[in-house]
Amino acid sequence: VVLPLFIVSIIAFLDRVNIAYAGLTMKENLPWLTPEVFGMGAGIFFIGYVLFEVPASLIAARCNAMHWVARIMFSWGLVCILMTTMTTELEFYVYRFLLGLCEASLYPVIYSLLIPNWFLPKERAKAISLMLTSLLFSNIIGGPLAGILLDTTFFGLHGWRTLFIVEAIPAVIFAFIFAFWMKERPEHASWVTNAEKVYIKAELEKEEQQKQAIKKYTTWQALKDPKVLRLALIYFLWVIGFWGFSFWMPQVLKSLSGWPPSVVAWSIAIPMTAALLVQIYCGYSSEKRNEKRWHVATTLFIG
C-alpha cells in the first residue's frame, strides 16, 4: 500500500521543484526570467496550493479518494507538459499557480484519508515516516536526473523543456496505473484475506467510536484549535527554510562555484543523501526512546 503512495509522492515532488533545476538554463531562452520573476513564480505555486488545499481535501473526502489522487495527478502532469510551451512571464505565473492548485490536496488526502483507511493507529507513524522519506529520496534522484535531462534533446526539445516534459510524463501515465493499483480500503483489495479485512475494519470502527465519544470535531473547530494553530506555525516556519533551500540551492551553488548546470544538479544529491540518513536515524531514535518533542526541536534548531 505504501509503495504506490511513495511513487506518487516522488513524482509530485519532482514536478514541484524541477523549476529549481530548469532555472539554471531557462534564462538562455527566456530573458525576462530575472531572480525576482523566478522567486515570484516559485512562490505563486503555494498561492494556488493554499487556496485549494482545504476545499479540495473536503471534496476528496466525499468521493473516492483513490480516483481523486489519480485525477489530480493526471492534471498536474498536463500542466507540467504545458510549461514547455511558455514564452511570457504571465504564462510562467499561470502555470505555476495551476500546478499548485492541482497538487494542493495530494498530501492531505494521503495522510488523512488513505493511510488512516489502511493502517491502525499504532502502525501509522511508520507509514507516515516512510512517506516523508519520499521527499528527500526524490531530491536525491531528482538532482542527477535533472543533470542528465538538461543535456538531453527529446523530440526536438532541449534543456529545461526536456526536463519538464520527461518528468511530467510519469505523472500522466502513473495516474492510470494508480487508479487500478491502489484501493481506497482493505475490503476492496483482493490481496487482503477475509480475516485481515474483518480485523482491520473492526479496529478502525473501534477507533472511530472512541473519537466520537471524546469529542466531535468540525472543520471550523479544528481551524480554531490552539494546538492545531501551534503545529501549523511550527510547520510553516520549517517549510520556509525547506522550500527556500529546495528552490534556490541550485542557483546559489552555480553562482558560488561556477560549475555547469549538470554538475550543480548532480551535487545537490550529496546534502539530500545526508538529510535522508539523519531523518531515518531520528525516526528510529524517536521510536526507541518514545520521545518526539526534543527530536523535532533539536533538528529544527540545527537546521
List PLM regions with ranges.
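Extracytoplasmic
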Residues: L3-P35, G142, F245-P250
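Extracytoplasmic gate region of multi-pass secondary transporters
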Residues: I19-Y21, W220-Q279
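Helix-breaking motifs and short loop linkers at transmembrane-helix boundaries and internal kinks
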Residues: W32, N64, T85-E91, C102, ...
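Conserved MFS/SLC helix-loop-helix module at the cytosolic interface between two early adjacent transmembrane helices
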Residues: L51-L90
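Cytoplasmic membrane-interface "Motif A"-like loop-to-helix N-cap segments
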Residues: A61-M73, E287-L300
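Cytoplasmic helix-loop-helix junction between adjacent transmembrane helices
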Residues: Y95-T133
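Glycine-rich segments within core transmembrane alpha-helices of 12-TM secondary carriers
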Residues: A125-L150, P170-A171
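Symmetry-related core transmembrane helices of the 12-TM Major Facilitator Superfamily/SLC fold
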Residues: R161-F180
